[in-house]
Amino acid sequence: MAKKSLIHREKKRQKLEQKYHLIRRSSKKEISKVPSLSEKWKIHGKLQSSPRNSAPTRLHRRCFSTGRPRANYRDFGLSGHILREMVHACLLPGATRSSW
């Protein structure tokens, strides 16, 4: 189980990313449309003044049950070993073990 402080930090990052999403997207569109370099620098400075944690690249997918940041399956929102345990216990409908 991940520390609660790390899970809380990740939730805080998600809120910041949602808050600044439109601002970041609009400023990136402006940068691509503006021809002069000096105006691009001004817009880039505005983009840089937004909080660091508002960038979507700083987000991690975490396991829904344990908060583990690695080996996550997007379809289930679970880490690999929790997914395996739940499939063995028949807790995930439609998921089957492969055998050949």
UniProtKB/Swiss-Prot annotation:
GO terms for molecular function: rRNA binding; structural constituent of ribosome. It comes from the Eukaryota. One of its GO terms (cellular component) is chloroplast. Keywords: Chloroplast, Plastid, Ribonucleoprotein, Ribosomal protein, RNA-binding, rRNA-binding. It is found in: Plastid, Chloroplast. Its main location: plastid. GO terms for biological process: translation. Part of the 30S ribosomal subunit. Belongs to the universal ribosomal protein uS14 family. Binds 16S rRNA, required for the assembly of 30S particles. This is Small ribosomal subunit protein uS14c.
